[in-house]
Amino acid sequence: MSHPTSTPAFTVADIRKSFLDFFASKGHTVVPSSSLVPGNDPTLMFTNSGMVQFKDVFLGTDKRSYVRAASVQACLRAGGKHNDLENVGYTARHHTFFEMLGNWSFGDYFKRESLKWAWELLTDVYKLPADKLWATVYIDDDEAYDIWTKEIGLPPERVVRIGDNKGAKYASDNFWMMADTGPCGPCSEIFYDHGPEIAGGPPGSPEQDGDRYIEIWNNVFMQFDMQPDGSVKPLPAPCVDTGMGLERLAAILQHVHSNYEIDVFDALIKAAARETGEKDLNNKSLRVIADHIRATAFLVSDGVNPSNEGRGYVQRRIIRRAIRHGYKLGKKTPFFHKLVADLARLMGDAYPKLRTDEARITAVLKAEEERFFETLEIGMTILDTALAGGAKVLPGDVAFKLHDTYGFPLDLSADVCRERGVDVDETGFNAAMDRQKNQARAAGKFKMDRALEYAGSGNTFTGYERLEETAKIVALYADGVPVAALTKGQSGVVVLDTTPFYAESGGQVGDEGELISGSAHFAVGDTLKIKSDVYGHHGTVEQGTLNVGDHVNARVNLAVRAATVRNHSATHLMHKALREVLGEHVQQKGSLVNAERTRFDFAHNAPVTDDQIREIEARVNAEILSNVATDASVMDMEAAQKTGAMMLFGEKYGDKVRVLSIGSSKELCGGTHVTRTGDIGLFKIVAESGVAAGVRRVEAVTGENALAYLQSLESTVQAAAGSLKASPTELQQRIGQVLDQVKSLEKEIAALKGKLASSQGDELMAQAFDVKGLKVLAARLEGADARTLRETMDKLKDKLKTGVFVLAAVDGNKVQIAAGVTADSVTVVKAGELVNFVAQQVGGKGGGKADMAMAGGTDASRLDDALKSVRAWVTERA
């Protein structure tokens, strides 16, 4: 990665200004960037695109004073479905914080103006070579295609029609939908060709995922209303929504390939190097720090401080990730907050709040740094103690304590343990911790594999036929670097000339097992592809030394492989059943198959009902009971297509493919599978959920795991039945009876509380005192809830006719407070002000109307003093 020494022709600041100036000249209102915290969508964690602040306009629930708008929107993607945090800093274009250039038409102009202005801006203002630009359109969008080819003059060979490449009607990279129903329409994307020296093919080609052709601008034309049945109707007033990544455009205009080489990042990377003392400006940790200072500073400016929940937890994760990378560079004292001044200098003109909030941002980040550096030191002490004496495994309870009590990142614990040749026992982690572990592990493996450089021959895979093989070590790696040997305690990657280990692919995880060579023992924790035909065996040397050239006995873990193949074969049967029960529109969107379960994502626009789940389970288990043999045949693609085998949209296949037949299912698949369907044993769906618009997820278990799941449910039912003194078959009826009894008792309790309140109300009247002719009462009402307080208050107001009342009750340490003022006294005393005065003294707050208000508190020990203070408060106002 190069680092510019001169000012580029178009700085990031220039690009922002010229974009807004251009669209202002076209009659657009320049709209300021909205907060990173969406104000109109509680379901969205962060503003992740320019259109978020206009969502209500598109939905028809809001109307602006303008019909054309342009903005440069600050965006953040970290957390939720847009969680790419582990990739940030390791790829050329992944960021947490980024800026989105956009222009919008709310029922005004449409495709012709949008595309022509986009072309004019790119070629006339930014001076991009016309022969470097490509465009895509939705396959049926003849209007957009004609505008590109006949009016703008883009050669037809550089305008690509994109069909429904996501498995269902209108499920396309070039068809945008806000949700399952509602506004939608085709889009036209503009791509920039970085040149033949970069790998990758044009959009729509099998090689489109390469880095040569980069999407820079998307023009969305909202012209339809998606109906519940999947049909579309024209919108009365079509709209335009466009978005162009500022960082991507800057990389092109500044003639660099990575976003981290543009002027803003170049300056921030140098600032991070200054504060950490790192000399290598290409160090990925510096890129992480440079990215994260933007995200965290803008979040603080928008009111998001680090915490342990919601947006605050995402903020804390980002901050601590940056600090961890500084720690890796040897920085043991707070440094991150010192970059705020650099950021304010670089981006303060575009975002003035960075300057006005600079001191507050710096203070918040510094406090979090100081807290976490203290946590790091404590965590390291705990780790050192736990690993003393040659321990080979960090106990799961210790790892959980580090994470839960000290906020110690799980990946940091694992990093320290790997350096010492120690594994982490993750059994004690709950499901949320397991999910977090898998995400970090998957991201870490990807980065490591991509870093390995292997120029030798491919290995022979024998894992379809056998699970044990004699093989020769042809390469060894430690920390991504080729080595001649791996010694005891060292983690690394082993490449063999022949292997029975399956490498992670097609959703199936890689095999586990062991490599034995004399007294040397290498525990394989995972198997991943270095290249398509080169498998890397990831693990740790537990005994002896492995050398390049050694012969080893490679043994796959039989139990783990058996459980994994059961789940994989069941996934094929489930896919077939899903299409039969839900419809042929069902297409695979993603999968994860391991020894514990199978997770399958598929295209479908509605939740799968309980009855449908039962039908799917019945069909899969019927295939299992038939116990038919499976068959795998390698053939030409043309022959495979003739067999009717299912092929996944977007999947890359070679000239030779493997057709797998399992029961009535036939798919292309390179994974490992059972010999007969009966080997699966039992199939049970355990979860169904939505993961994105038009995408559902099913999770299922098989074999012993399915039996264990059902036995667990049985134990729960039996325990519940025992508690209710009923048999399992009587449980539902008994629960209904108990619920009826509870409702009856609740009514009785409410009636008794009302009687109690009435009797106490008479007694309380005697406690009222006079303040300048105004009756005032401030007292406890024992055993009352909020409803009883209100009812008693109403009765007191009826009886006394004129006065001010405060009633309070305590439940545990929680305080409920009611304040009431008769109609003739509200000009003197407001109930809302009075209840807040009392509530603040017991650690709470509240509100309401002038004549009645409620509040809560958390410090019951101060209630009596708070009630006594009412006399003085009313006296001041009477």
Curated annotation (Swiss-Prot):
Q: Record-annotated residues binding Zn(2+)?
A: 568, 572, 669, 673
Q: Which cofactors, if any, are listed as required? A: Zn(2+)
Enzyme Commission number, as recorded: 6.1.1.7
Q: Where in the cell is it found?
A: Cytoplasm
Keyword Ligase belongs to the record: yes
Q: Which UniProt keywords apply?
A: Aminoacyl-tRNA synthetase, ATP-binding, Cytoplasm, Ligase, Metal-binding, Nucleotide-binding, Protein biosynthesis, RNA-binding, tRNA-binding, Zinc
Textual note on the cofactor: Binds 1 zinc ion per subunit.
| Molecular function per GO | alanine-tRNA ligase activity; aminoacyl-tRNA deacylase activity; ATP binding; tRNA binding; zinc ion binding
Question: What is a biological process (GO) this protein takes part in?
Answer: negative regulation of DNA-templated transcription
Q: Which reaction does it catalyse?
A: tRNA(Ala) + L-alanine + ATP = L-alanyl-tRNA(Ala) + AMP + diphosphate
For this record, an example GO cellular component is: cytosol
Its principal location?
Answer: cytoplasm
Q: Is Electron transport a UniProt keyword of this protein? A: no
Give the family from UniProt: Belongs to the class-II aminoacyl-tRNA synthetase family.
Q: Which NCBIfam families match?
A: alaS (TIGR00344)
Name by which UniProt lists this protein: Alanine--tRNA ligase
